[in-house]
Amino acid sequence: MKFPRIGLPKEKVIELINEKTKKDLTFSSGKILGSMCTMPHDLAIEVYTKYIDRNLGDPGLHPGTRKIEEEVIEMISDLLHLEKGHGHIVSGGTEANILAVRAFRNLSDVEKPELILPKSAHFSFIKAGEMLGVKLVWAELNPDYTVDVRDVEAKISDNTIGIVGIAGTTGLGVVDDIPALSDLARDYGIPLHVDAAFGGFVIPFAKELGYELPDFDFKLKGVQSITIDPHKMGMAPIPAGGIVFRRKKYLKAISVLAPYLAGGKVWQATITGTRPGASVIAVWALIKHLGFEGYMRIVERAMKLSRWFAEEIKKINNAWLVREPMLNIVSFQTKNLKKVERELKSRGWGISAHRGYIRIVFMPHVTREMIEEFLKDLKEVLS
């Protein structure tokens, strides 16, 4: 496609976009079942649109938006049982995880740094390892798909700069034994990073509802940083990931001076320079509007629906759960999995076959009616 010399009327451009996006699945259809993102909350869309010109890459021009980000980090830190946290709203969990690894590396004096992480960890750590020159040391999983803490300990060496635990794995929504990892980290004087990109906006509310889940946050003294994504169960617009550090030294270790900005020179810790302030304002608006009780109701509905679905899967011939769900993610296997996946996708379902199983993520846009329709199609495909 050539760069056009003469532009088209606005109406024609919109018409072309509508035509090109016809094949896209939409959250409003209810048929996207394999995504950890969802349709943003109406308030978030309104706020994001109004403040779309704000750039936190140059915070001196937007001091009000910078203050809002500080308050967002304060509120998220409070949710995570930390009185004074230090961090940013970033592009997503990938950037947040890379920042954590970079901070651990920069504060170490190791020539050949190593990071110990579960085999269930997100692929963003592979990017972090390649970009930062950090060797990834993969820890084995237990039969229940949580990380084997004994194997983590066995792999600690003089080169270990950090340990990673997962609070809501991508494939199964499993929460590692973070308390045990925290104790281990303290015993060896090694920082622990918790990737709660998904679970961060689920676990605090699920625990309040009575679900038995391990502690995962700054209540545990070994935890030094947490990834938490408002654009997942927080219902914020993309991009809105989050990174929170226990101590300011971690942010300082990854900050570089940007001396030429219109709003004045500033120390910048994020990977991206230009950064959408609209995302930050939308997150602030949602936390203020929904509050703990509002998010708890969202999580309650998702957890109940996921438990009902898990029981329905158990009733279907030639389908079985990989494990009982911990969060609002249910994964199951079938006979002829690839064929089943193709058939379901041909019927319009946005699912993912992850490591040999189909994963259903019960996000706020997923309804009981659509899940009943999915189960009907699944039974037909398996019959």
Swiss-Prot record:
Residues with N6-(pyridoxal phosphate)lysine modification: 232
Required cofactor(s): pyridoxal 5'-phosphate
Temperature dependence: Optimum temperature is higher than 97 degrees Celsius with glutamate as substrate.
TM region(s), chain numbering: none
Reaction catalyzed: L-aspartate + H(+) = beta-alanine + CO2; L-glutamate + H(+) = 4-aminobutanoate + CO2; L-cysteate + H(+) = taurine + CO2; 3-sulfino-L-alanine + H(+) = hypotaurine + CO2
UniProt GO MF annotations: aspartate 1-decarboxylase activity; glutamate decarboxylase activity; pyridoxal phosphate binding; sulfinoalanine decarboxylase activity
Single GO biological process annotation from the record: carboxylic acid metabolic process
InterPro entries per the UniProt record, alphabetical: GrpII_AminoAcid_Decarb, MfnA, PyrdxlP-dep_de-COase, PyrdxlP-dep_Trfase, PyrdxlP-dep_Trfase_major, PyrdxlP-dep_Trfase_small, Pyridoxal-P_BS
EC number from the UniProt entry: 4.1.1.11, 4.1.1.15
Keywords: Decarboxylase, Lyase, Pyridoxal phosphate
Signal peptide: none
The protein's enzyme class: lyase
Subunit description: Monomer.
Purpose: Catalyzes the decarboxylation of L-aspartate to produce beta-alanine, and the decarboxylation of L-glutamate to produce 4-aminobutanoate. Can also use cysteate and, to a lesser extent, cysteine sulfite (3-sulfino-L-alanine), but not L-tyrosine. Specific activities toward L-aspartate and cysteate are higher than toward L-glutamate.
Protein name per Swiss-Prot or TrEMBL: L-aspartate/L-glutamate decarboxylase
Gene for this chain: mfnA
